[in-house]
């Protein structure tokens, strides 16, 4: 069954009642962990209530540590707030992961600076290959080998994570150890190291539509089923069928692509 839930977006912390939702999920029997992916802008002020709700792990998106470039990429001048949120989360004992999308010809100069956070602090930094869905179709991404080569030129040769039993996360990230780092460097490489065979996720949009894969629009409208006052067995069977029919793999490398739904 489903035992781990991640609240993501968009930006979940701008949604009214997200703290109460997190609390409800944490208190649901069978749910072992609820985590949050955020841009970090409002995280610092919401940390106490999130921790009280039962959220003890956050992923914070950060594609540059240059203030001017951050404003260009996001449209907001909020880099300081994001950095304060990272430090505050660490001080509160939360598990922190920083996510950086590797953008070709855009943030290459920032990769080593963002990676340095894992050297100076007990957090993990993950570099994510750009997936050609939604706005990602118009952006060029860099592959894991390119990022890793640049990081090793600065910090020395990396080695695969020694302790494979370490509880680092629930997803497809593969972690590497760099000399002298407190944290690990992870790579989420959907393009160069296709991990579909090990994918254990389904996704629910803000409208209650459940999808088995980010790329494809196919899914189940759970909100409609709930409003139809169906019995629990109907909902369970709908989810079971959705998971059973989960696509074998994405088709990012082809032009034959269904309409994706990235929310």
Predicted regions and their residues:
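Radical SAM/AdoMet-radical enzyme domain recognition
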Residues: 1-7, 11, 15-128
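Short flanking/linker segments adjacent to small metal-binding domains or redox-active Cys/His motifs
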Residues: 4, 242-263
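Short, intrinsically disordered/low-complexity patches at protein termini
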Residues: 39, 234-235, 259
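Short amphipathic alpha-helical patches
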Residues: 48, 73-74, 112-113, 141, ...
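Short, conserved beta-strand edge motifs with alternating hydrophobic and charged residues
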Residues: 99, 126-130, 177, 187-188
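Accessory C-terminal segments flanking Radical SAM cores
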Residues: 134-251
């Amino acid at each position: 069954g489903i035992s781990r839930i991640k609240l993501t977006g968009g930006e979940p912390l701008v949604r009214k009642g997200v703290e109460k939702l997190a609390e409800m999920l944490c208190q649901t029997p069978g749910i072992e962990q609820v985590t949050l992916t955020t841009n970090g802008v409002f995280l610092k002020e919401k940390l106490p209530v999130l921790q009280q709700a039962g959220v003890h792990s956050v992923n914070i998106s950060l594609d540059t540590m240059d203030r001017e470039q951050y404003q260009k990429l996001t449209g907001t001048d909020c880099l300081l707030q994001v950095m304060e949120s990272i430090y505050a989360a660490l001080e509160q004992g939360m598990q922190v992961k920083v996510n950086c999308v590797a953008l070709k010809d855009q943030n290459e100069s920032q990769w080593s600076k963002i990676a340095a956070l894992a050297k100076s602090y007990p957090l993990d930094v993950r570099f994510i290959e750009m997936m050609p869905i939604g706005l990602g179709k118009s952006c060029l991404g860099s592959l894991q080998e390119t990022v890793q080569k640049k990081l090793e030129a600065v910090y020395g040769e990396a080695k695969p994570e020694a302790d494979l039993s370490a509880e680092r996360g629930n997803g497809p990230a593969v972690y590497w150890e760099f000399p002298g780092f407190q944290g690990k460097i992870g790579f989420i490489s959907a393009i160069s190291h296709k991990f579909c065979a090990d994918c254990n996720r389904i996704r629910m949009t803000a409208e209650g539509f459940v999808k088995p894969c980010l790329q494809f629009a196919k899914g189940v409208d759970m909100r409609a089923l709930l409003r139809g006052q169906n019995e629990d067995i109907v909902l369970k069977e709908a989810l079971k069928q959705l998971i059973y029919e989960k696509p074998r793999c994405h088709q990012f490398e082809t032009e034959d692509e269904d309409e994706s739904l990235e929310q």
